[in-house]
Amino acid sequence: MLGVGDTAPEVSAQNQHGETVTPAFERPTVVYFYPKDFTGGCTIEANEFEDALPEFRDADIEVYGVSLDDVETHADFAEEEGLSFDLLADPDGEVAAAFGIDTSEGYTARLTFVLADGEVVATYDPELADPSGHAREVLEETREAYV
């Protein structure tokens, strides 16, 4: 798994609208990996990122959610939950692999990376705790460090 100080990977994936997204990772960017759309903890986490999205945007911090779900599933999930940030579809696990995340179980672990200036600047493992409050923690720490 990538750690603090590692170079940001070059990745591209389709979002829930079928558009190809290639994050630059120059300005502060949050990439959070989650196991699966429409599951309890993942839905909580996505909604918390959505609720905090205006504050992320005010601080010029990008947010991307990534799972092994396909574009259509992401589109359904985003519509049902009212998510307006990009959910990147990674059905072949290429984005996860670029971050050093294991997908052998058919899903990714719940992991979050903050990238800026072309490198990883923070990592979070909310798998160790309830995902509630995770988005707020990431926002506050990233805003404090980079804004």
Residue ranges and their predicted role:
Residues 1-147:
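Chalcogenol-based redox active-site neighborhoods
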